[in-house]
């Protein structure tokens, strides 16, 4: 570690190293200087050193070095010159951003260069293997190596700066600016993973701010400037999350904003709240939570109407229409029906959380909470006057879906209204904080609601209905979609329907109608019948004469007297009932008064206990503050005692606070440190002079000692050289003697070597031959196994193909059999239809024949009798023959005696009347036209009367 007397020397040394290309050594030198304890007093030179330091860190992509240096520099200048730290950090981020942009501009394929899932993750083994196998040596790989590292370094830069600036009241603005730039980085380059981590980092910083409340320079969220900075950061986070499509992170951002507002107990400006509710509508719409989406729209409408006075009538109409359509899009049944107890509890907690996010007010008691529901939302729309601001199409749609009872043509009337609504919407004016409103997004949900309403109304009128008729009545969807909607409604206990696809019918299971539903049906039925009666029987004109008006005066007076007596008794009963109700109300009021008194007493006791607890806490805090003040004063006295100036400590009694005393102590310590550094610099300078003088005096002595040492070492070297030569001669003579001694055994060694080599060669040949035989056997056995396996596979495949062929033949035979049966059934049905048609024609011929015979009989009777008479009543004809003719002798029958029955036509003849009597009229006033229809009927058809079931829908249509 190099030591420099002055910081300027370190800066010069670093520049020299950079000039010769040794950037790593220059960075290390500056790092040692910055992290050294000698330079803890801020000076302008340190700022220049930090600029050079961050430039080297950016050039070499050393994020860890940059973080360590910035932390040390923050310690140095935090109490002296915080603006210097801001300038260094801004320069650092500017350099990192500039280098990242430069690398991005150099890359020609940005899409491939940025295709990295996580900037903090290393390369996976699979990616490395794929790159080596595929030989990725071209431009794509160079782009990855060029662009991705710089974006990774830029992301590390943002993280480092946020970590350094966190929870510091003097650096709040720079912290907010860095967070905004980090959000824009994630938004510009679609970095979803880094955005989630960034949100978590900011969330942890706020949690630590609330956790460590006694730290120095802690931001005060109750200050308007600090609160506005934090809120702006959170709203920017919310906007970027919605633009990136991270809806879960956007919802967590909403919770962060709500928690921040609850923490400081302040509501932001109306412009921010409009953005808040606008993003809530998008989040709830994407999560298919239509109820909360509608409530958020209602809050947004209230804000726009209350605070935005420049809003045009058209924009207000579109926003109000969105509110009503969002409310209508809410499913009309309970989504949590059939859930378990645990799921219901979780849903209650979730609903409570969302209600707090939407309304910012929560009832403390659970029994007093009003649950968010579709009915309460619609009633609130009416009470707040939203319906008066919507377009006429939306009003018509609301009336059709919520007030009308049209079980047959509801969907047909709703469809053109939805077509008009889908064309409404568009961009709003710049005055409105809502950029765009599209009403067409609600059309699918409204079509589903219209389908549910139609099925509900049909189920209240009919028992069965054909599937084809349902499809014709609902033009929005196919029957598969209608069936899916019906199944969901049945699962939620909204409908009770059974679908029989074999018969093509939909059975609407009988249910006991609720009083409300039956009342609505009866009301519509009464109105329809009243209109029909008025059309058939118009009201008669009032009598003009006074006598006609007073004809029943006595009866009217009697009725009026009875009515007055009944009214008097009713009034007496009502008075008694009212007195009883008053007594009951007094008892209830007394009970309530006692409960309120009891609750007041309990609240008073709680208040007294809370005040006592508060006083006790204040006393404890006062004791802690006094003790800390004493410790700080003692520290200040001790610092003054250590000081050489013997300055009297500044104490003003109760006016001195802990913060002031701590600042005095810190200033004193800083002054002592600076004086100590000056002394050390002076001492280092004197030591340099002393060392230089010592070395000048010691230089001649060292030179003479060196020459003497050279002479001694030369003599020693010559002596050791002679000794080594003598020893070498002695070793050579010994080696020659040893060679002569071993030369006589050379022949024996050769014989033994040949013997061993021959035996080893024979053994090697044998083992090689055995190995070859073993390999041949293994190869032969494997060939046999392979052949057997191939035969088995061939056999299995052949068998499988045979089975498949048999199966296909069987299926073809079954299809032919089914087609043959279907054809025979069609032929049989055609024959039956032909037989039925022939029988119908024969019956028509019989009727015509019978009619002609009847007319022939009438003509004969008219020709015989001088006066017309009523034709006789015909009996039932035979199965296949006509009616028997009446004999003509009956016309000239003699006059019977008294007491005998005489037919009517004979009595007419005997009386000799000039004209025939008029025909009798039935009691219904049907006229004198005789009934020419035959009195027989087809025995094959069941009678059309006497059925106890309700009329089905197709029958009523006929």
UniProtKB/Swiss-Prot annotation:
Cross-referenced InterPro entries: EIF3A, eIF3a_PCI_TPR-like, PCI_dom
Gene Ontology MF terms in the entry: mRNA binding; translation initiation factor activity
GO cellular component: eukaryotic 43S preinitiation complex; eukaryotic 48S preinitiation complex; eukaryotic translation initiation factor 3 complex, eIF3e; eukaryotic translation initiation factor 3 complex, eIF3m; multi-eIF complex
Keywords tagged on the record: Coiled coil, Cytoplasm, Initiation factor, Protein biosynthesis, RNA-binding
Domain of life of the native organism: Eukaryota
Residue ranges constituting the PCI domain according to the UniProt record: 316-513
Xref: Gene3D superfamilies: 1.25.40.860, UVR domain
Coiled coil: 93-123, 548-696, 796-861
Subcellular locations according to the entry: Cytoplasm
Segments of skewed composition (Polar residues): 946-958
Chief location of this protein within or outside the cell: cytoplasm
Comp. bias regions, Basic and acidic residues: 804-859, 929-942
Residue stretches of biased makeup (Low complexity): 877-894
Region: Disordered, residue numbers: 804-958
GO biological process: formation of cytoplasmic translation initiation complex; translation reinitiation
Record's subunit section: Component of the eukaryotic translation initiation factor 3 (eIF-3) complex.
Record-stated family: Belongs to the eIF-3 subunit A family.
Stated name of the protein: Eukaryotic translation initiation factor 3 subunit A
Taxonomic source organism: Nicotiana tabacum (Common tobacco)
Highest classification ranks of the organism: Eukaryota, Viridiplantae, Streptophyta, Embryophyta, Tracheophyta
């Amino acid at each position: 570690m190099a030591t420099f007397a002055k910081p300027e020397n370190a800066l010069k040394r670093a520049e020299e190293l950079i000039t010769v290309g040794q950037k790593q050594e220059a960075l290390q030198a500056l790092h040692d200087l910055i992290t050294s304890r000698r330079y803890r007093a801020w000076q302008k030179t340190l700022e220049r050193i930090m600029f050079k330091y961050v430039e080297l860190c950016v050039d070499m992509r050393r994020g860890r070095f940059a973080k360590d240096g910035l932390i040390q520099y923050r310690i140095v200048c935090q109490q002296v010159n915080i603006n210097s730290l801001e300038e260094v950090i801004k320069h650092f981020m500017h350099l990192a951003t500039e280098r990242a942009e430069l690398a991005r501009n150099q890359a020609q394929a940005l899409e491939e260069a940025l295709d990295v899932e996580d900037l903090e993750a290393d390369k996976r083994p699979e990616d490395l293997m794929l790159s080596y196998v595929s030989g990725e040596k071209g431009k794509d790989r160079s782009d990855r190596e060029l662009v991705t590292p710089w974006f990774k370094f830029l992301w590390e830069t943002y993280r480092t700066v946020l970590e350094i600036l966190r929870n510091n009241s003097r650096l709040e603005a720079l912290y907010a600016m860095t967070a905004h730039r980090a959000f824009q980085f994630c938004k510009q380059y679609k970095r979803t993973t880094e955005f989630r981590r960034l949100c978590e980092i900011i969330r942890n910083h706020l949690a630590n701010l609330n956790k460590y409340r006694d730290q120095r320079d802690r931001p005060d969220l109750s200050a308007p400037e600090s609160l506005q900075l934090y809120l702006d950061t959170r709203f920017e986070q919310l906007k970027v999350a919605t633009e990136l499509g991270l809806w879960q992170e956007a919802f967590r951002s909403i919770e962060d904003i709500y928690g921040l507002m609850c923490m400081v107990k302040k509501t932001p400006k109306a412009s921010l709240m409009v953005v808040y509710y606008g993003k809530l509508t998008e989040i709830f719409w994407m999560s298919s939570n239509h109820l909360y989406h509608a409530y958020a729209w209602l809050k947004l409408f209230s804000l726009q109407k209350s605070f935005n006075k420049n809003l045009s009538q058209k924009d207000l109409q579109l926003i109000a229409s969105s509110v009503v359509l969002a409310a209508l899009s809410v499913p009309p049944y309970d989504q949590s029906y059939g859930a378990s107890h645990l799921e219901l509890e979780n849903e209650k907690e979730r609903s409570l959380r969302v209600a707090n996010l939407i309304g910012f007010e929560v009832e403390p008691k659970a029994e007093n909470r009003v649950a968010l529901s579709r009915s309460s939302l619609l009633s609130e729309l009416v009470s707040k006057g939203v319906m008066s601001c919507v377009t006429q199409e939306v009003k018509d749609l609301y009336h059709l879906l919520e007030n009308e009872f049209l079980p047959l043509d509801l969907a047909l009337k709703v469809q053109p209204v939805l077509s008009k609504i889908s064309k409404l919407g568009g961009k709003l004016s710049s005055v409105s904080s809502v950029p765009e409103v599209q009403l067409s997004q609600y059309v699918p949900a409204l079509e589903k609601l219209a389908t549910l309403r139609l099925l509900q109304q049909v189920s209240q009128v009919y028992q069965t209905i054909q599937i084809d008729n349902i499809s014709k009545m609902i033009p929005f969807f196919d029957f598969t979609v209608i069936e899916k909607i019906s199944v969901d409604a049945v699962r939620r206990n909204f409908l009770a329907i059974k679908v029989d696809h074999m018969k093509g019918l939909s059975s609407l299971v009988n249910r006991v109608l609720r009083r409300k539903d039956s009342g609505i049906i009866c009301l519509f039925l009464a109105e329809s019948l009243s209109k029909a009666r008025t059309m058939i029987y118009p009201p008669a004109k009032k009598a003009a004469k006074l006598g006609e008006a007073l004809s029943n005066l006595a009866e009217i007076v009697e009725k009026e007297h009875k009515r007055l007596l009944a009214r008097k008794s009713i009034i007496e009963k009502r008075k008694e009932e009212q007195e009883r109700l008053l007594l009951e109300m007094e008892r209830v009021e007394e009970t309530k008064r006692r409960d309120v008194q009891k609750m007041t007493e309990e609240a008073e006791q709680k208040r007294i206990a809370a005040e006592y607890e508060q006083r006790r806490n204040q006393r404890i805090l006062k004791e802690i503050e006094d003790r800390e003040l004493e410790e700080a004063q003692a520290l200040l006295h001790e610092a003054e005692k250590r000081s050489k100036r013997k300055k009297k400590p500044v104490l003003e009694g109760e006016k001195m606070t802990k913060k002031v005393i701590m600042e005095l102590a810190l200033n004193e310590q800083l002054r002592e440190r600076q004086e100590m550094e000056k002394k050390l610099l002076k001492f280092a300078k004197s030591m340099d002079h002393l060392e230089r003088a010592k070395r000048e005096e010691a230089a001649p002595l060292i030179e003479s000692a060196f020459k003497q040492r050279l002479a001694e070492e030369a003599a020693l070297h010559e002596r050791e050289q002679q000794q080594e030569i003598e020893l070498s001669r002695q070793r050579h003579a010994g080696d020659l003697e040893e060679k002569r001694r071993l030369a006589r055994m050379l022949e024996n060694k050769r014989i033994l070597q040949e013997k061993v080599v021959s035996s080893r060669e024979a053994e090697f040949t044998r083992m090689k031959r055995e190995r070859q035989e073993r390999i041949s056997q293994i190869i032969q056995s494997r060939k046999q196994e392979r052949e057997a396996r191939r035969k088995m596979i061939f056999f299995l495949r052949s068998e499988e193909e045979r089975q498949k062929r048999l199966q296909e033949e069987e299926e073809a035979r079954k299809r032919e059999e089914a087609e043959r049966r279907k054809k025979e059934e069609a032929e049989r049905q055609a024959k039956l239809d032909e037989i039925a048609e022939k029988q119908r024609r024969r019956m028509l011929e019989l009727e015509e024949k019978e009619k002609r015979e009847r007319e022939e009989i009438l003509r004969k009777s008219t020709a015989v009798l001088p006066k017309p008479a009523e034709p006789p009543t015909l009996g039932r004809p035979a199965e296949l023959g006509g009616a028997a003719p009446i004999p003509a002798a009956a016309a000239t029958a003699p006059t019977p005696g008294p007491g005998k029955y005489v037919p009517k036509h004979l009595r007419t003849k005997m009386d000799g009347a000039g004209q025939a009597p008029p025909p009798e009229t039935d009691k219904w006033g049907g006229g004198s036209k005789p009934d020419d229809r035959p009195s027989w009927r087809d025995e094959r058809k069941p009678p059309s009367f006497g059925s106890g079931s309700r009329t089905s829908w197709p029958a009523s249509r006929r």
